Regions:
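Receiver (REC) domain active-site loop signature in two-component systems and cognate sites
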Residues: 55
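Acidic catalytic/metal-coordinating carboxylates
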Residues: 33-34, 59-62, 86
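Acidic, metal-coordinating helix/loop segments flanking the phosphotransfer/catalytic sites
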Residues: 31-48
């Protein structure tokens, strides 16, 4: 069964590009362009989440805090924020990785694959 990825970003170009890329290499892709959609998409039980921080209705830190209470899958922040304090906060609220825009899609794919391999070794990413 194909692994699934949830992409949460208010920049539609990024969502579209990542959607096409990950679909092409065999992932089932779910997308959300704001916090409300992201919270609804969690019910699809993605294996991994790519999460922007800067969004108009709810920032990625808040989304991560809210979903971390019932989702154990890896969360990779994908953001333009480069400050160490933002990276530290991202990990503090439950993020597993932090990738700064602009990013290499190949590197992002490698990080996604590494996190999913780790999850497979340590158990499922089921909702707890």
């Amino acid at each position: 069964m194909a692994q699934s990825i949830l992409i949460v970003d208010d920049e539609r170009d990024i969502v579209s590009m990542l959607n096409q890329y990950f679909c092409k290499i065999g992932y089932v892709v779910y997308t959300a362009i704001n916090g409300k959609e992201a919270l609804n998409a969690i019910t699809k039980h993605p294996d991994i989440i790519l999460l922007d921080i800067n969004m108009p209705d709810m920032n990625g830190f808040t989304i991560c805090e809210k979903i971390r209470n019932f989702v154990s899958c890896p969360i990779i922040f994908l953001t333009a924020r480069i400050e160490d304090c933002d990276k530290i906060k991202g990990f503090a609220v439950g993020g597993d990785d932090y990738v700064v825009k602009p990013f290499s899609v190949d590197e992002l794919e490698a990080r996604v694959a590494a996190h999913l391999r780790r999850e497979k070794r340590h158990g499922s990413s089921a909702i707890v």
